[in-house]
């Protein structure tokens, strides 16, 4: 490990569950050393909300943060994003949270994208990286649970909710869903796992990157691996043996694996077209038709997946989780005996799924990488004073940038818009708010009825209602 390595543990609170369309409310982060000892001052700030966005009332119920509080205490989104970048981009930083790979990192990327900050470099440039404690916690429960007090839901299934785990392990965690409280709780859980299961911690830390994971994978021999993922289900500790079959035909970061506890006969018997249809059909619908789920899964090697050699799943561990190792070995033999399985699974994933057309440039982050020239010009945009943004004189290769720039100016520097641009923005804003209004009002109604005897919740809902009415005019 490099000498000046540090973790930056962070968390967002937000106004919705979709990082592409919802907005951050609060950011908190703390820098620690490799042993999770705090070495930096805690950082927390709010983000002002723009007038083209309605918050989800449910989110306010969870966090207790209102848009009015954000607008009173917060930074503009460009400042908010720049402050986060300053922390994340310090050399040899490993950015980590609790479910950050699937949520917080996505919120970061979309926030950076809207504000002309390159959305990926913070997690790989200058010796930087990322990791997710949630998957490590799942792996610890499945593979080496000793030393941790585990939490369970009423149905007896393990719970990996941070507030339940901290309570089970007597870790202070007041104000759950306050970003700073969640950061302290994440640090404490990480320290606990490193202390109680140091070998497991070190193995998955050292093997979190793409290059290390690629070394584990042998699609030619279909060498089985242990895989832990929330997609696999709590009933088996989110754990299984998988056989790596092939690399995705169009996504170099995706590995096609087969769950060796699944219905392999069905996989071998059906055509690629039949399997593709089943793969994108809801599990409940398949069950109603008496059809078994397709035992295929994509593992994204750029998302710090939990993969380890098959021997990591000890016989006694497999028994505890209800995983039949002999069934897995028998299924592996069937796969290895199939002459066309690799070709078939590649074919399944080769046909692009058709998605509804999208006219919102702000959700098009993954529609391509920006060229170096565009990245340089975006950095220039960020440095320009507001009055110069309309006469930047820069040539962009990517058509998304000019539309993003219009939104950026309209939200943060409205007075710099021409009369025609103001009319265009008013029309865009009105259309966007009207689309959100029906669900916003229905959510408020549901929540008012559900919390009719809770004055604190009703006060929050009243504030959200007043905020929404003001935006909707």
From Swiss-Prot:
Record site: Interaction with single-stranded DNA: 109, 120, 124, 138, 210, 253, 302, 366, 369
UniProt cofactor note: Binds 2 Mg(2+) ions per monomer.
GO molecular function terms noted in the UniProt entry: 3'-5'-RNA exonuclease activity; 5'-deoxyribose-5-phosphate lyase activity; magnesium ion binding; single-stranded DNA 3'-5' DNA exonuclease activity; single-stranded DNA binding
Phenotype upon gene inactivation: No visible growth phenotype in rich media, no change in UV or mitomycin C sensitivity, no change in the spontaneous mutation rate, no change in the rates of slippage in tetranucleotide repeat tracts (i.e. phase variation). A double exoI-recJ deletion strain has a 2.5-fold increase in spontaneous mutations.
Site (Important for activity): 177
Cross-referenced PROSITE patterns: EXOI_C, EXOI_SH3
The ExoI SH3-like domain, residue ranges: 198-353
One Pfam family per UniProt: RNase_T
Assembly and oligomerization: Monomer. Interacts with ssb (via C-terminus); this interaction stimulates the exonuclease activity by recruiting the enzyme to its substrate.
Domain notes: The N-terminal exonuclease domain and the exonuclease C-terminal domain form a central positively charged groove which binds the DNA.
Protein name: Exodeoxyribonuclease I
Species of the source: Haemophilus influenzae (strain ATCC 51907 / DSM 11121 / KW20 / Rd)
Encoding gene, per UniProt annotation: sbcB
């Amino acid at each position: 490990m490099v000498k000046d390595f540090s973790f930056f543990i962070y968390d967002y609170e937000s106004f919705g569950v979709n990082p592409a369309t919802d907005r951050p409310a609060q950011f908190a982060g703390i820098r620690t050393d490799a042993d999770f000892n705090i070495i930096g001052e805690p950082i927390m700030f709010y983000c002002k909300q723009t007038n083209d966005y309605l918050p989800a009332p449910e989110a306010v119920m969870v966090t207790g943060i209102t848009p009015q509080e954000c607008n009173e205490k917060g930074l503009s989104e460009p400042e908010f994003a720049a402050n986060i970048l300053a922390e994340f981009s310090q050399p040899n930083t490993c950015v980590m949270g609790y479910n950050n790979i699937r949520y917080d990192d996505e919120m970061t990327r979309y926030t950076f994208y809207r504000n002309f900050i390159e959305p990926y470099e913070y997690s790989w440039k200058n010796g930087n990286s990322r990791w997710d404690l949630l998957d490590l916690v799942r792996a610890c429960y499945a593979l080496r649970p000793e030393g941790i007090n585990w939490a369970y839901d009423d149905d007896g299934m393990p719970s990996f909710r941070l507030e339940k785990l901290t309570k089970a392990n007597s870790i202070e965690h007041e104000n759950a869903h306050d970003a700073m409280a969640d950061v302290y709780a994440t640090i404490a859980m990480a320290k606990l796992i490193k202390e109680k299961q140091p070998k497991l911690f070190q193995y998955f830390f050292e093997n979190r990157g793409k290059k290390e994971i690629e070394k584990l994978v042998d699609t030619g021999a279909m060498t089985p691996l242990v895989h832990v993922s929330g997609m696999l289900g709590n009933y088996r500790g989110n754990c299984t043996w998988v056989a790596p079959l092939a690399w995705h035909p169009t996504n170099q970061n995706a590995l096609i694996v087969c769950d060796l506890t699944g219905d392999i006969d069905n996989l071998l018997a059906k055509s690629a077209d039949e399997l593709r249809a089943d793969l994108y059909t809801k599990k409940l619908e398949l069950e109603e038709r008496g059809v078994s789920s397709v035992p295929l899964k994509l593992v994204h090697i750029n998302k710090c997946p939990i993969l380890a050699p098959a021997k990591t799943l000890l016989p006694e561990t497999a028994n505890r989780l209800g995983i039949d190792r002999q069934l897995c070995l028998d299924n592996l033999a069937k796969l290895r005996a199939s002459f066309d399985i690799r070709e078939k699974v590649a074919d399944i994933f080769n046909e692009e799924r058709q998605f509804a057309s999208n006219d919102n440039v702000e959700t098009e982050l993954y529609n391509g990488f920006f060229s170096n020239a565009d990245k340089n010009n975006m950095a220039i945009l960020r440095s320009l004073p507001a009055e110069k943004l309309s006469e930047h004189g820069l040539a962009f290769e990517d058509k998304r940038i000019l539309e993003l720039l219009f939104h950026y100016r309209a939200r943060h520097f409205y007075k710099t818009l021409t009369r025609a641009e103001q009319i265009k923005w008013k029309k865009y804003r009105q259309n966007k708010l009207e689309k959100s209004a029906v669900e916003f009002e229905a959510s408020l109604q549901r929540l008012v009825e559900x919390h009719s005897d809770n004055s604190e919740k009703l006060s929050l809902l009243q504030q959200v209602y007043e905020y929404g009415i003001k935006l909707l005019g």
